[in-house]
Amino acid sequence: MWRGCVSRGLRSLSKGKGSSSSAPVSAAARLFSTASSSYTVVDHSYDAVVVGAGGAGLRAAIGLSEHGFNTACITKLFPTRSHTVAAQGGINAALGNMTEDDWRWHMYDTVKGSDWLGDQDSIQYMCREAPKAVIELENYGLPFSRTEDGKIYQRAFGGQSLDFGKGGQAYRCACAADRTGHAMLHTLYGQAMKHNTQFFVEYFALDLIMDSEGTCQGVIALNMEDGTLHRFRATNTILATGGYGRAYFSATSAHTCTGDGNAMVARAGLPLQDLEFVQFHPTGIYGAGCLITEGSRGEGGILRNSEGERFMERYAPTAKDLASRDVVSRSMTMEIREGRGVGPLKDHIYLHLNHLPPEVLKERLPGISETAAIFAGVDVTKEPIPVLPTVHYNMGGIPTNYHGEVVTMKGDNPDSVVPGLMAAGEAACASVHGANRLGANSLLDIVVFGRACANRVAETAKPGEKQKPLQKSAGEKTIAWLDKLRNANGSLPTSKIRLNMQRVMQNNAAVFRTQETLEEGCKLITKAWESYHDVKISDRSLIWNSDLIETIELENLLINACITMHSAEARKESRGAHAREDFTKRDDEQWMKHSLGYWENEKVRLAYRPVHMNTLDSEVESFPPKARVY
């Protein structure tokens, strides 16, 4: 293939002088030439560069600008179109507005939800910071739903308890009706506009710029509007590029969720962590994949099978429909397998909201009522919604510590910090979610760790610090690869390779997995990667070339998919979202460790690093592993 990693070897390119009429005044432009084309390359220098403008990227950019850092935010789509906008249910924080609460109880639930694969120092940091993060959002102007006495309304959510699991259901999820992500994204974008962050909208980040010592010096990106290439030099680069849900055929993710940051890191020779843990949300609309928030069950919604039975009472006697997501998804899948599915093909389940008062639906779940009417054709006040477990979230990603700094294995040190590189949000793996994320912890994750990245930069750097110059050849290999890809003349269109990859992932790395399906999946996903060598691009232009962009995104997805499948095949246990039918028990002795997947010479190499069982300080003791029952 044209590129296996950033260090791919290509002949040196001739360089000439040139300028770009669209380049900012402060940027220097020149031409890079390949055998077939010349490319305008514009150089920029910033204290910090954020890649991605969803919740994590915006919160990082806001923090950096507040600390006085000259900050650029690169995003492939307009900030308010980022996938954070699709988050519905809410954001967890132990505010105690509905019942007594404590961040330590929240931490216990998160550790238990992670099936003891989460790093307890990072989880402590997130849960302790949560109330502060929510109050900060309120001060920014986020229009939270309210109780009658004016406090932020908090609803019940899955896997949440009081008093370390002994005190019943917690009401911890602060929400803005069922459009919390939408409210958050617009609120954060408004805040970012107040500060001096420079946005580069519709710029597609292609690769990290790494020096010979393994320090990240920035990124190279394509301006999709005019076809110019841009090298962003920065002391600190923060990746907030989201997940890779579109590697699957049916997903709640937007079509833009293609794991771009993950793939950039993998090509730079750094590992991706715990990619085998893919969350299936229990309630995607049957046939459409659109999300029905867990908040619908938090407000009293009930799952029923073809016999009208509330079957979750059998699988999770205490939590019932509000067990954690992996438990509910597996339970639904088992009901369908055993012939108790609904519909003509008996291949889905009903979510009943029709017993709830219409005023509750109107006030607390207005978006769900609308979504169900459009995509399922049902009136939720009278009929159940047809639902099916659907790919929703990637627990794995770029390994980081609780400061947001990217870490890698270096000699005997499993926590070696990669200088100049950070990550936050779904792209990162801190790991606060471990093997299974609790609902409403993702919006918390993005604001807490977006802010943590900015604070860490403020601790370790000063605005305006002198930077090491880029090598003249920095980014040349990426440009040569882009040129080759743009002129690719194989026999397979991007859409055909992508569909094949999505079907392999859907069939072979699903809710339940076996050695047979995973071994077959490894072979098939490798073939899908090999077929990418034969891709055909019809549009040769550089301006608004969706064919080219989708092909780059496909490469990024394929890298994520290959590492996911191989990591899943290697893990011989069931833990959280990784459910093996041939290894049905959790094996703490052999497998309480993080998987690391390296992308080397177009093949996956696996390694492992320990889970952090330690807490940050004496405020809370670590929670030892025990059976996970809801």
From Swiss-Prot:
Its main location: mitochondrion. InterPro entries: FAD-dep_OxRdtase_2_FAD-bd (IPR003953), FAD/NAD-bd_sf (IPR036188), FRD_SDH_FAD_BS (IPR003952), Fum_R/Succ_DH_flav-like_C_sf (IPR037099), Fum_Rdtase/Succ_DH_flav-like_C (IPR015939), SdhA/FrdA/AprA (IPR030664), Succ_DH/fumarate_Rdtase_cat_sf (IPR027477), Succ_DH_flav_su_fwd (IPR011281). Pfam families: FAD_binding_2, Succ_DH_flav_C. The keyword Transmembrane does not apply. Component of complex II composed of eight subunits in plants: four classical SDH subunits SDH1, SDH2, SDH3 and SDH4 (a flavoprotein (FP), an iron-sulfur protein (IP), and a cytochrome b composed of a large and a small subunit.), as well as four subunits unknown in mitochondria from bacteria and heterotrophic eukaryotes. It comes from the Eukaryota. GO terms for biological process: mitochondrial electron transport, succinate to ubiquinone; tricarboxylic acid cycle. Its EC number is 1.3.5.1. GO terms for molecular function: electron transfer activity; flavin adenine dinucleotide binding; succinate dehydrogenase (quinone) activity. Residues 1-31 form a transit peptide. Pathway: Carbohydrate metabolism; tricarboxylic acid cycle; fumarate from succinate (eukaryal route): step 1/1. PANTHER family: SUCCINATE DEHYDROGENASE 2 FLAVOPROTEIN SUBUNIT, SUCCINATE DEHYDROGENASE [UBIQUINONE] FLAVOPROTEIN SUBUNIT, MITOCHONDRIAL. Its cofactor is FAD. The modification Tele-8alpha-FAD histidine is found at H83. It comes from Oryza sativa subsp. japonica (Rice). Gene3D superfamilies: FAD/NAD(P)-binding domain (3.50.50.60), Fumarate reductase/succinate dehydrogenase flavoprotein-like, C-terminal domain (1.20.58.100), succinate dehydrogenase protein domain (4.10.80.40), Succinate dehydrogenase/fumarate reductase flavoprotein, catalytic domain (3.90.700.10). This is Succinate dehydrogenase [ubiquinone] flavoprotein subunit, mitochondrial. The lineage of its organism: Eukaryota, Viridiplantae, Streptophyta, Embryophyta, Tracheophyta. Belongs to the FAD-dependent oxidoreductase 2 family. FRD/SDH subfamily. GO terms for cellular component: mitochondrial inner membrane; respiratory chain complex II (succinate dehydrogenase). Substrate binds at H281, T293, H392, R437.
